[in-house]
């Protein structure tokens, strides 16, 4: 079974951590003042120290000038005890910046999972109107601060540019940048302590300031409050070296998250906690657009939930929204397919973080627990490096603390996509962890050399196939979009199909093959014409291999339907000759006639057909519903519909047909079609091994997912073709 192997590195010198000698996957720093280690008193601690030093993990921190790393870390741990951390930002893969409520800015320089340098900057201490900072924005040219109790924003400009040389490693204090500090009033409820959050767009010319709706919406002193005072989302711009409120709106529901789009810098994405007409909890995914410096809501997608949302996260491409709920359920909404997935977590999902590659997502609780799901919400086991193999569903951090400390933040160590494009082949295997009042640390994912340290969608499919977890691999493939990830989809499909074609054909594997090819031939939403033209030839090679695989096991009905979808003359002739050898004369005649029709069509049109002729040219509904085993013996009632019920597209003339559209070259006369359908129906009636698929045409649902169709309108997606 596939699982993630990890190491936990805690950046702490405290003796309150409870790390056993045999915990070779958990590390902390030790002080030189500690008494000498004795093998008889401390068991295997000496061996663990030798193991750490052999891997270039420091056992004790150096205190050389000017860094004085050990003293700086002790000062940082004391600071975390006295002041809350309001912001942590990864300036690059090597530098993390922490801003505390008192105005202290701490920069951490890393080398792998280990601390290399700690710089504590107190340039802002005593220069602000308040030491209760709510949120902050840190860029290379300015800082913006919001406060808990004041309706003001602090705008700090750098009149001197930051040195760009070796920007990934260089740490510079704010005092060297000649700060210019100014304050600006903003609308909103006065005399109230509110968490005012900030976000900036990729072009760094717009800022949004937002806060949750106040529950006790009472406005004293004025009979009618102005719309400006009731607003909870502000759009700000930069004018003449300062900040200006450009627009303000009051959201319909209380927002859970607000940020600018990564690809559309003038769109604002929000997630709002709403309620349906039946008083059922929902999440509204809204898009606001800035038009002439005014915010307008242009899109609202309502997602039904099982309980109130408490956390949310979007993937890097922003086509998937993950919502964590109070009842430990995790909801994933896929925008490109318009479907919703549900999984039940083993913990309360207070924190959610999606890997930059979009392959996995991590769910954490304040109690110090961590669980991993793939992007199709299949759970993945996790284990710390140890002598024994013991992967589990969750990872427990709390057992390493003598004093209880809640997990308040987890973040992948990578710069935001809006500020820096990830380099090709760059490894992202470190998860930053911050516990309340300390310590800080990272969780290192040991991804191995076979994937070259990568954790992408294709890498995850390869891992699933390595452990023969085909359903999980197919669900990953189904979640991928051919229009944007075509090459990765092709590689993933090839991996799954090649694995299945090497094995004996069974009803289950046949359904899995259909599901894999169906991601291209029968997508939930039609693919772009350019996508079909680019990938139909390599995908058809896999379809041809499946066709001959079906013939090898004498699955004539399915092979015929697949040949109809592919629309190639040689496939029908293969059926014709094999059917003659097997004594299936009726099938041989139908296949020969279909091959002849394709010849006629090719001559008349001057091109070789690459797809089916027409929906009415296919076998009738009774023939298309033929199954694998005699009635009463179907042990796979939740398998997929046959490939013959899917649609291929030849991109020449679009003919609407029910919910999907098919492509044809020319229509045949109704008399010819009726005559052939009668023969095919007679052939289907004579087939002794034909039964029907289940009415839903769905692949058996993973037992770890729960069907909530009875409790709401949430749509469940099963593995297989829809």
Curated annotation (Swiss-Prot):
Skewed-composition ranges (Acidic residues): 671-684
4Fe-4S in keyword set: no
Repeat found in the keyword field: yes
WD repeat locations: 305-343, 344-383
Predominant cellular place of this UniProt entry's protein: membrane
Residue ranges crossing the lipid bilayer per the database entry: none
Phenotype upon gene inactivation: Y-shaped metacarpals and defects in palate and tongue morphology characteristic for a PFD syndrome phenotype.
Quaternary assembly: Component of the CPLANE (ciliogenesis and planar polarity effectors) complex, composed of INTU, FUZ and WDPCP. Interacts with CPLANE1.
Family: Belongs to the WD repeat fritz family.
Protein's name in the database: WD repeat-containing and planar cell polarity effector protein fritz homolog
Organism: Mus musculus
Lineage of producing organism: Eukaryota, Metazoa, Chordata, Craniata, Vertebrata
Gene from which the chain derives: Wdpcp
């Amino acid at each position: 079974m596939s699982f993630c192997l990890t190491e936990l590195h805690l950046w702490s010198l405290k003796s309150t951590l409870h790390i056993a000698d045999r915990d070779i996957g958990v590390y902390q720093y030790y002080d030189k003042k500690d008494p000498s280690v004795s093998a008889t008193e401390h068991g295997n601690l000496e061996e663990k120290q030798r193991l750490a030093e052999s891997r270039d993990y420091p056992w004790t921190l150096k205190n050389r000038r000017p860094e004085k790393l050990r003293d700086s870390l002790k000062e940082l741990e004391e600071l975390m005890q006295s002041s809350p951390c309001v912001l942590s930002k990864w300036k690059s893969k090597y530098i993390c910046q922490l801003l505390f409520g008192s105005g202290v800015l701490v920069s951490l320089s890393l080398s792998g999972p280990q601390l290399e340098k700690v710089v504590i900057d107190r340039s802002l201490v005593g220069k602000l109107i308040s030491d209760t900072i709510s949120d902050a924005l840190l860029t290379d040219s300015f800082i913006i601060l919001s406060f808990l109790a004041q309706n003001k924003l602090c705008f700090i400009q750098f009149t001197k540019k930051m040195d760009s040389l070796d920007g990934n490693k260089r740490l510079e204090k704010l005092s060297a940048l000649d700060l210019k500090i100014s304050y600006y009033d903003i609308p909103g409820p006065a005399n109230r302590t509110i968490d005012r959050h900030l976000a900036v767009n990729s072009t760094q010319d717009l800022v949004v300031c937002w806060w949750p709706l106040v529950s006790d919406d009472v406005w004293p002193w004025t009979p009618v409050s102005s719309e400006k005072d009731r607003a909870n989302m502000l759009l700000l711009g930069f004018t003449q070296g300062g900040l200006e409120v450009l627009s303000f709106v009051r959201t319909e529901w209380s927002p859970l998250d607000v940020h600018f789009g990564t690809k559309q810098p003038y769109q604002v994405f929000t997630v709002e906690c709403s309620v349906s007409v039946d008083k059922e909890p929902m999440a509204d995914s809204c898009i606001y657009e800035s038009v002439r410096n005014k915010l307008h809501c242009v899109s609202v997608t309502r997602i039904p939930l099982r309980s109130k949302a408490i956390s949310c996260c979007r993937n890097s491409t922003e086509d998937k929204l993950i919502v964590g709920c109070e009842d430990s359920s995790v909801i994933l909404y896929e925008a490109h397919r318009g479907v919703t997935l549900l999984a039940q977590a083993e913990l309360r999902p207070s924190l959610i973080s999606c890997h930059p590659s979009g392959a996995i997502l991590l769910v954490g609780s304040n109690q110090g627990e961590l669980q991993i799901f793939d992007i199709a919400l299949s759970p993945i086991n996790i284990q710390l490096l140890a002598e024994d193999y013991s992967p589990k569903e969750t990872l427990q951090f709390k057992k390493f603390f003598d004093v209880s400390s809640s997990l308040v933040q987890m973040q992948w160590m990578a710069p935001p996509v809006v500020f820096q494009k990830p380099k090709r082949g760059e490894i992202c295997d470190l998860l930053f962890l911050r516990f309340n009042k300390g310590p800080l640390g990272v969780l290192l994912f040991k991804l191995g050399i076979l994937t070259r340290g990568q954790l992408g969608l294709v890498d995850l499919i390869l891992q699933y196939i390595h452990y023969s977890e085909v359903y999980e691999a197919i669900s990953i493939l189904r979640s991928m979009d051919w229009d944007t990830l075509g090459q990765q989809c092709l590689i993933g499909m090839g991996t799954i199909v090649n694995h299945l074609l090497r094995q004996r054909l069974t009803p289950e594997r046949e359904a899995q093959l259909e599901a894999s090819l169906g991601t291209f031939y029968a997508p939930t939403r039609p693919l772009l014409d350019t996508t079909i033209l680019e990938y139909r030839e390599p995908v058809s090679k896999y379809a041809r291999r499946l066709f001959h695989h079906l013939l090898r096991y004498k699955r004539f009905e399915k092979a015929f339907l697949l040949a109809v979808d592919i629309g190639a003359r040689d496939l029908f002739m293969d059926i014709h000759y094999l059917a003659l050898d097997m004594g299936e004369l009726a099938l041989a005649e139908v296949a020969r006639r279909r091959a002849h029709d394709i010849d006629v069509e090719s001559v008349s049109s001057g091109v070789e057909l690459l797809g089916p002729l027409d929906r009415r040219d296919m076998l009738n509904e009774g023939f298309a519903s033929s199954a694998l085993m005699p009635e009463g013996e179907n042990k796979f009632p939740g398998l997929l519909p046959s490939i013959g019920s899917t649609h291929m597209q030849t991109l020449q003339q679009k003919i609407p047909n029910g919910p999907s559209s098919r492509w044809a070259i020319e229509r045949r006369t109704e008399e010819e079609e009726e005559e052939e359908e009668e023969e095919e129906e007679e052939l289907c009636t004579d087939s002794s091994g034909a039964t029907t698929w289940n009415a839903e045409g769905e692949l058996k649902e993973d037992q770890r997912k729960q069907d909530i169709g009875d409790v709401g309108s949430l749509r469940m997606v099963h593995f297989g073709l829809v």
